[in-house]
From Swiss-Prot:
UniProt modified residues of type Phosphoserine: 103, 245, 259
Annotated protein name in UniProt: Phosphatidylinositol polyphosphate 5-phosphatase type IV
Sequence-type repeats, residues: 52-55, 76-79, 240-243
Membrane topology: Peripheral membrane protein
Tissue expression as described in the entry: Highly expressed in testis, in pachytene and diplotene spermatocytes, but not in more mature elongating spermatids. Detected in neurons throughout the brain.
Lineage of source species: Eukaryota, Metazoa, Chordata, Craniata, Vertebrata
Family: Belongs to the inositol polyphosphate 5-phosphatase family.
Phenotype of null mutants: Deficient mice display signs of ciliopathies including prenatal and perinatal lethality, polycystic kidneys, arrest of eye development, abnormalities in primary cilia, cerebral developmental defects, and skeletal defects.
Gene3D superfamilies: Endonuclease/exonuclease/phosphatase
Function: Phosphatidylinositol (PtdIns) phosphatase that specifically hydrolyzes the 5-phosphate of phosphatidylinositol-3,4,5-trisphosphate (PtdIns(3,4,5)P3), phosphatidylinositol 4,5-bisphosphate (PtdIns(4,5)P2) and phosphatidylinositol 3,5-bisphosphate (PtdIns(3,5)P2). Specific for lipid substrates, inactive towards water soluble inositol phosphates. Specific for lipid substrates, inactive towards water soluble inositol phosphates. Plays an essential role in the primary cilium by controlling ciliary growth and phosphoinositide 3-kinase (PI3K) signaling and stability.
Subcellular location: Cytoplasm, Cytoskeleton, Cilium axoneme; Golgi apparatus, Golgi stack membrane; Cell projection, Ruffle; Cell membrane
GO molecular function terms noted in the UniProt entry: inositol-polyphosphate 5-phosphatase activity; phosphatidylinositol-3,4,5-trisphosphate 3-phosphatase activity; phosphatidylinositol-3,4,5-trisphosphate 5-phosphatase activity; phosphatidylinositol-3,5-bisphosphate 5-phosphatase activity; phosphatidylinositol-4,5-bisphosphate 5-phosphatase activity
Length: 647
């Protein structure tokens, strides 16, 4: 009677062969198997003697039946897991979490829950072990054809079956068999270690988006909930006192909290106890109080830009105003821009549009005023318009006979927080020898300007009815004062031709305005920053040469910016210069950069309530965008038309 192993070797059906593969048993064949790449080839000999395999784990029932019948009765059933009824991928979620029922509890006890554990560690097969990898195992997981799975189907040689079964079982199963055969604890993935020590970081880069969303991570489910709870605690203002920071209680760096709200929390009792009509300098929650001022200006200093330019009535405006409004010497833009124009262009609206276009959407036109050909425009950062009072203006005409208001003064005033400002732009009488007329223009201006009107004086005890400059905390007076350099053109040109640098201090000794200010006959209490630029008048249009006409006017510092303060040291000049690149007029624009001390105020003043020129704002933005599109199209056409030549 033939042995059981012999019967099985000659009578195994395809379905039985598949069952052996699913239980981890190799197919027993008498023919040579084609080796799979990456595995050890089988021996050239036939039979189980030359290719030893571990004994089968199929229990044999003792019976007197025919061996062929016994072989047919021994039909191993595939395990419930893994199911190879469909094509699986190593990246499939179910494949990463697969576990055998018999080893699931043991793995949990031995290894514990680790969010860094891989799928190969979590899957351990309870199957017989083999001393070396099987030649029929492949790296692919293919679906077993149903026609081949039917029990009792026949046909095909063992060699053909080995070729067909190649690629049915993945490398993962092979690894699991090896782990089970070792008898020890399941293998673990090696810990990840940096190849080198990373550099020290001074910023927190904690981010929920960088956290691995591993399904085996027990903390993943409630991670978002914990983060939301932390933010609620950080931004909660229901406590008995105001937190020190909107980010109080949060362990994130301020630099990494860009998605958090940086608005200061407002206590409910501050809103209920506060009265709009009766403000206080130190009232908590006051709109113009110290607390609000500290939010925007911690050092209580605001940046101010003041400029003057005699445009000579030219209709043509410069192609760019960047050098005028955005000088390269300033790293940052200013909080307030005040521009005074004398002999302005006929289209005042176009001029203001150009200013809005240059400054961009971060600034709005707070107010603008005109007196004949005298223009003044005030642009402020859009987030500061809520702290301005109503803007008032007044005018003075010094040339009464003329119907055209070319000479005179224009004053604009308002209060910012608790500091009152007065800006005056003037065009005094021209002529080398008309110093007395210019002194008269000054006296008439300080007496005739009727400011302020509705906004109360911040310090009425230090005000004078005969001098408008005494009624405000900070005063800036700028314009074309027409004071000349005495001594004649020849003497002035001799100074200008000095090399390598012009001795400006020696040149200013001949300045009429400097001489009159030292006498105290004009601009009493005013100061001027040191001058380090060349005379701003009179140039040939479009050129850097001074007047070459028959009149041969003497180069002079006619365009000036002066300042005055009630409190000494409140105004600090940062830069005082001219714009030699703007050559559309016979005058060069002159500007000054200042830091001005700002004090808290009361809420009982008439506020502008965010009023600004909305129409001009929209026009400036549209023009800015259209020019940017044109510039980009020009760059594209230029790059596409470039020709590369090889010589």
């Amino acid at each position: 009677m033939p042995s059981k192993s012999a019967c099985l070797r000659h009578t195994e059906a395809p379905g039985q062969l598949e069952g052996r593969m699913l239980q981890g048993q190799p197919p027993n064949t008498e023919k040579k198997l084609i080796p799979t790449p990456g595995f050890l080839p089988a021996s050239d000999s036939q039979g189980s003697e030359t290719n030893p395999m571990p004994p089968f784990s199929i229990p044999a029932k003792t019976s007197n039946q025919n061996p062929q019948t016994k072989a047919n009765l021994i039909t191993p059933q595939p395990p419930i897991r893994p199911k190879l009824e469909r094509t699986l991928s190593l990246d499939d979620k179910g494949w990463r979490r697969r576990r055998f029922r018999g080893s699931q509890e043991d793995l949990t006890v031995q290894n514990g829950a680790s969010p860094c554990r891989g799928s190969l560690q979590d899957s351990v097969a309870q199957s017989p072990a083999y001393s070396r990898p099987l030649p029929c195992l492949s790296t692919s997981l293919q679906e077993i054809p149903k026609s081949r799975r039917a029990t009792g189907s026949e046909g095909g040689s063992p060699s053909l079956w080995s070729d067909c079964l190649s690629g049915m079982i993945s490398t993962s199963l092979d690894l699991l068999h090896r782990d089970a055969a070792s008898g020890g604890p399941p293998s673990r993935l090696a810990s990840l270690h940096a190849s080198h020590t990373p550099p020290a970081m001074d910023l927190s880069i904690a981010s929920s988006s960088l956290r691995t969303a591993n399904k085996v991570d027990p903390e993943h489910t409630d991670y978002k909930l914990r983060m939301q709870t932390r933010l609620v605690r950080a931004h909660s203002n229901l406590g008995p006192s105001r937190p020190r920071s909107p980010l109080a209680g949060d362990d994130h760096s301020i630099h990494s909290a860009r998605s958090f709200s940086l608005l200061a929390p407002i206590r409910t009792k501050d809103i209920r106890s506060r009265s709009y009509l009766e403000g206080s300098l130190l009232a908590s929650g006051a709109l113009l109080g110290a607390e609000e001022l500290a939010r925007y200006f911690p050092d209580r200093n605001m940046a101010l830009f003041v400029a003057t330019w005699n445009m000579q009535g030219q209709k043509e405006l410069p192609a760019s105003l960047d050098e005028f409004l955005l000088p390269t010497e300033a790293d940052y833009t200013q909080d307030l821009y005040v521009i005074g124009i004398q002999e302005g262009c006929s289209d005042r609206r176009e001029w203001e549009t150009r200013l809005q276009e240059t400054l961009g959407p971060q600034y709005v036109l707070l107010s603008s005023a005109a007196h004949g050909v005298l223009y003044m425009s005030l642009f402020i950062r859009r987030d500061l318009i809520w702290f301005c009072s109503e803007v008032e203006y007044s005018t003075v005409t010094t040339r009464i006979v003329s119907q055209i208001k070319t000479k005179g003064a224009l004053g604009v005033s308002f209060t910012f927080f608790g500091t009152s400002f007065l800006f005056i732009t003037s065009h005094f009488t021209s002529g080398d020898g008309k110093v007395a007329e210019r002194l008269l223009d000054y006296s008439r201006t300080i007496q005739a300007l009727a400011l302020p009107r509705n906004v109360p004086d911040t310090n009425p005890y230090r005000s004078s009815a005969g001098d408008v400059t005494t009624r405000f905390d900070e005063v800036f007076w700028f314009g074309d004062f027409n004071f000349r350099l005495s001594g004649g053109r020849v003497a002035v040109e001799a100074f200008l031709k000095q090399k390598p640098e012009v001795d400006v201090l020696a040149l200013l000794q001949h300045d009429q305005l400097t001489r009159e200010m030292k006498k105290g006959s004009i601009f009493r209490g005013f100061e001027e920053a040191e001058i380090h630029f060349l005379p701003s008048y009179k140039f040939d249009i479009g050129k850097d040469t001074y007047d070459s006409t028959s009149k041969q006017r003497t180069p002079s510092y006619t365009d000036r910016v002066l300042y005055k303060s009630r409190h000494k040291g409140d105004i600090c000049p940062m830069k005082y210069s001219s714009c030699p690149g703007i050559k559309t007029s016979d005058h060069r624009p002159v500007y000054g950069l200042f830091q001005v001390k700002v004090r808290p105020g009361r809420d009982n003043i008439p506020l502008a309530a965010g009023k600004f020129d909305r129409e001009l704002y929209l026009i400036g933005i549209k023009r800015r965008i259209s020019k940017e599109i044109q510039r980009q199209e020009a760059l594209k056409s230029q790059s596409s038309s470039a020709v590369c030549t090889v010589s």
